[in-house]
Amino acid sequence: MLTKFKSSFSAFVRNETSGATLLLAATIVALLWANLGGHSYEHFWHTHFSIHLGDIFSVDMSLQHWINDGLMMMFFFLVSLEVKHDFVMGELREWRRASVPVVAAVAGLIVPALIFYAFNAGTDDADAWGVVISTDTAFVMGILAVFGNRLPVQLRALLVTLAVVDDVGSLLVIATVYTERISFVPLIGVVVIAALLFLVQRARVYRSSVYIAAGATLWLLFLASGVHATIAGVVLGLLLPVFPPERSEVLRAEELTHHFRRTPVASTGSAAVIGILRSVSINERMQLALAPIVNLIVVPVFALSNAGVIISGETLQHAFKSPLTWGIIAGLVGGKYLGVFGASIIATKLRIGELAQCLAYRHINAGSMLTGIGFTISLFIID
């Protein structure tokens, strides 16, 4: 019975659609909880939790902010690892292919903001244009997981890159436009840590503990600076080394493994493990380790803590009379689509970049429709 349960659980974890299922379930639960549970939803997620280390530092945030600023760093770290892998070894290693999602992402930031401003120019809400500029990477990845292998791998790579560039741009907007105070001293520390990480990756250090410590330090520094702390995940992910296995390292790992089989003791087992770790980049190992945690825990918990929007007849009636609502709808639904799809066509027609051979404009058209899902960064801006 226990063996059967373990087998079923392992299959659930490996299934790409499991994360999307949990994400949808968490969103529904959040909506029901917020609308049927009185004020318990708001009270629970606004409960404060603090960590103190003597007089050195203290962090005091609500549970919702711990999730948005802390747990979501793991999500951005994972997608940045995937982007780095695609740029170095995957579908986007040629600049002409990588340039299309980058150009599309920039246009996807500008066009929605202009449309939103056109609806709200001259009102007190005109400065809220940042709400419509972001694509929700978590939800887009969840939707892509539902389709699984029915979508080209190249489309996923393009959309992931587009979403990451989009999110980084949106987070920079938060840092420069919507952040009241930025402390530059911690940012100097960020530059120092990033420079050290660059040197470490050049040396192909394989121990994950080094990068975990660096990531925690980056997170604290970004948090202290006033810049959104999830950027730490992006910086760390882009600085982790990725490389194809070298034949000599693979042969060495194989030799050590055979030696362990002949002499199964702790010393030979440890040597075999180290040999295998050295042959695989830290980027790929981190992706493998973090994917189930992020997809099955982090993203659903994020949705549960943020998707609880109170819906009533009165709020809907007021919303649809407001130019703010129509600016958001037009910016996200129309602006993101026009910006991303239009820029992709222009970039390819002007030969700024090119699409992968198996991708057609119909794929980009479908993918562009997904970019109008704006949730994560919009909530960060609202905060």
Language-model features: where?
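C-terminal ends of transmembrane helices
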Residues: 4-10, 77-93, 141-152, 195-206, ...
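Structural signature of hydrophobic alpha-helical transmembrane segments
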Residues: 64-76, 124-138, 161, 179-192, ...
